[in-house]
């Protein structure tokens, strides 16, 4: 939900799922999360010279989560695109529960949580009869270093000042912590129907190159963002331009040794690893 174009991704999934079900296929499932790789998105975009793709505030992220949640639980959508509500935020969980009750789509929804993060919440969910998927991290001893990044993320979530889990221990109504979290939810709820869903990532390699004016500071050209459809089309055109076939006349590049030019008449076929089973002639 931290991506502005998450709404478009949900639209694509819904269109695919509806066509699949209408054609006699089974529904698919979408797992809705708030900020699984949010920090990494910021780091990667900075290193590659791209705009930061995430929403600028936690309130906007929460609002987008509620927007996608409401859309996903509507009967016409939930029957083809089942929803996994991944959250440890009591207010978000309660909102999803009430929405599903309102729309009659409880059977198409599961709650998804992490072992050890908020065990009292998933236990309460189970007591209510809700379906809960509990994720438990498992790692072999020889791969334990791979768990460090996971543990650091969990520690960060449990200590971030705006994060629900920071205030969740011994949380009670009519306390300072409760009022703070309730206000967070109310602000997000008020914003959910007024969001724009436009990504700041608009790089387009099809456009003519515009030289950058000289400056005292050297700036690298941003890396090409191959996630963007317009850049994928740009690459396809380049590939089509230079793609060779085994039936074509090979380009002859003579070998020059000193003043002598040597042209070999032998022809050999080699597997072109860029074109699967095609061969190029040398």
Predicted regions and their residues:
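Short, structured beta/alpha segment
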Residues: 166-282
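Positively charged, amphipathic and often flexible ligand-engagement surfaces
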Residues: 1-216, 222
